[in-house]
Design a protein with these regions (language model features):
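Rossmann-like NAD(P) dinucleotide-binding subdomain of oxidoreductase/dehydrogenase enzymes
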Residues: 104-240
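Structural signal for hydrophobic packing residues in well-ordered secondary-structure cores
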Residues: 31, 46-49, 53, 64, ...
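Short, well-ordered beta-strand elements within core beta-sheets of diverse protein domains
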Residues: 25-31, 123, 231-232, 262-265, ...
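Residues at or immediately preceding the N-termini of alpha-helices
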Residues: 16, 35, 53, 238, ...
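Conserved C-terminal structural/oligomerization subdomain of aldehyde/semialdehyde dehydrogenase
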Residues: 2-3, 10, 34, 326, ...
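Residue-level signal for inorganic ion chemistry
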Residues: 38, 84, 145, 176, ...
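ALDH superfamily catalytic-core signature
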Residues: 10, 171, 204-343, 366, ...
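N-terminal Rossmann-like NAD(P)+-binding subdomain of aldehyde/semialdehyde dehydrogenases
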Residues: 1-112
């Protein structure tokens, strides 16, 4: 059966190029949309999402083969709406030119930075949060005054069609265009000469996107992933840490780029934490097999990948504990698992898990835990559980990650006034809030001179007394 997103090969490059050209022409005709116009775009987007939420919920549920409506509301629609409202409240301040200081030697003059739209922005959206990870960057790009092309994931065809229909009702194609299609379409999309390209997805695909963009010298923002660690301190109540880690790990069945990937636990507390985690998970989900609150794995390929991680770990000596051993698995709902006695030779400790499998790693000293993290690629998120402010400061100072959440998981991503982005292999650049506006804007430096031109006193021919005075005052 042909995918509903499939496009005839002959049309891929032609259609994309035509859409891009139409947006480029529209931008050339209106290169600096006023605040009122941008606010109307944002308002229209917000109202359309609210009006069309049920269709989006049903489409996402269909794509996952079981996704809680409440999870979609809380993890996709709510942050999308809140992000739009945040941009609406602050847009005029963000657009205001920023006055800058002019050095004494260059007076009289004034300096300012003005924020201009870049032009046509490309956004490549992943499958795990097909709404939020489209609307979040779209909000920043529209707030900055750009035209936008979105490439939606072929792994979530129902969601892609629903979001495309919604956006087509709100925006003309030369303002916001939604592109559907398989891998070949995505590859062609990444080769378009965008003024900025934002990609969210796997690290190895991010490398390919960056290589494609480099051919056009297109700047990129890459939101990737990695193995985001959680550290449980020696003093934090285990029930508290376990409950919050369980929520972060099981939301969307762990298919979250900032989900805690593994947990570092004081050696003497390892078994107690495992027990607390089991209890916390069972409180959240008394059962998983027929529980509409618990999301399914997106497709058979991802389910098989996760099963292979379990099989590999078990074969190499890990203790693998299914937290729901008595249930008959139905569909693609994979129960949460705990893994102990893990080591670096296991694939589960090398790859981003992206599922409800949680390895536990013992440590004896906090610096040992930090060294373990720092010896590995820099993660997208880091979580620390402990109320000692000295230890909190130590963790912040001696670790690198895209973002940090102290005493909870995931929630830093939902803060509209905090930037979201990775570091190193987990990504580059930021969006959300003001940082999103800046990412999709050109900060243009403007210096304005007055009629009096003191600078002419240092023009050639050189060797004048005033030039020697300037050297003495400023550089010698």
């Amino acid at each position: 059966m042909t995918s509903p997103l499939a496009l005839p090969t002959v049309h891929v490059h032609t259609d994309l190029a035509a859409t891009f050209a139409a947006q480029r022409q529209a931008f050339s005709s209106h290169p600096m949309p006023p605040a009122a116009q941008r606010l109307q775009w944002l308002k229209s987007l917000r109202q359309a999402l609210l009006a069309g939420q049920q269709a989006l919920i049903e489409a996402i549920d269909a794509d996952f083969g079981g996704r809680s409506a409440d999870e979609t509301l809380l993890a996709e629609l709510l942050p999308s709406i809140q992000g739009i409202r945040h941009a609406e409240r602050h847009l005029q301040r963000w657009m205001r030119p920023s006055r800058r200081r002019v050095g004494l030697a260059f007076q009289p003059a004034s300096a300012r930075v003005i924020y201009q739209p870049l032009g046509v922005v490309g956004i490549i959206v992943p499958w795990n949060y097909p709404l939020f990870l489209a609307i979040g960057p779209l909000t920043g790009a529209l707030a900055a005054g750009n035209r936008v092309m979105l490439k939606l994931s072929e792994s979530t065809p129902a969601s892609a069609l629903a979001l495309k229909a919604l956006l087509q009702r709100v925006f003309p194609e030369d303002l916001v265009s939604v592109v559907l299609g398989e891998v070949e379409v995505g590859q062609a999309f990444a080769h378009l000469p965008f003024d900025h390209l934002l990609f969210t997805g796997a690290t190895h695909i991010g490398r390919q996107v960056m290589q494609a963009a480099a051919g056009n010298l297109t700047p990129v923002t890459l939101e990737l992933g990695g193995k985001s660690p959680a550290i449980v301190s020696a003093s934090v109540p285990l029930d508290t840490a376990a409950e919050r880690i369980a929520f972060g790990k099981t939301l969307n069945a762990g298919q979250t780029c900032v989900a805690p990937d593994y947990v570092l636990v004081p050696r003497e507390r390892l078994q107690a934490f495992a027990d607390a985690y089991r209890n916390a998970v069972h409180k959240l989900y008394p059962q998983v097999a027929n529980n509409p609150d618990y999301s399914a794995i997106i497709n058979p390929r991802q389910l098989q990948r996760l099963q292979q991680l379990l099989d590999d770990a078990r074969a190499k000596g890990a203790e693998v504990v299914d937290l729901y051993p008595d249930e008959n698995r139905q569909g693609r709902r994979l129960p949460p698992h705990l893994l102990t006695r893990v080591n670096d030779g296991m694939q589960v400790m090398q790859d981003e898990i992206f599922g409800p499998l949680l390895p536990l790693v013992p440590y004896d000293r906090l610096d040992e835990a930090l060294a373990y993290i720092n010896q590995r690629p820099r993660p997208l998120a880091l979580y620390y559980f402990g109320y000692d402010r000295g230890e909190q400061a130590h963790v912040l100072q001696y670790s690198h990650s895209g973002g940090v959440c102290l005493n909870d998981t995931l929630l830093h991503v939902a803060q509209d006034d905090l930037p979201f982005g990775g570091i190193g292999p987990s990504g580059m650049g930021h969006y959300h809030g003001h940082e999103g506006f800046l990412t999709f804007s050109k900060a243009k430096a403007v210096l304005t001179k007055q009629r009096l031109n003191v600078a002419r006193l240092i023009y050639p021919p050189y060797g004048k007394a005033l030039q020697r005075l300037v050297y003495r005052l400023f550089i010698r």
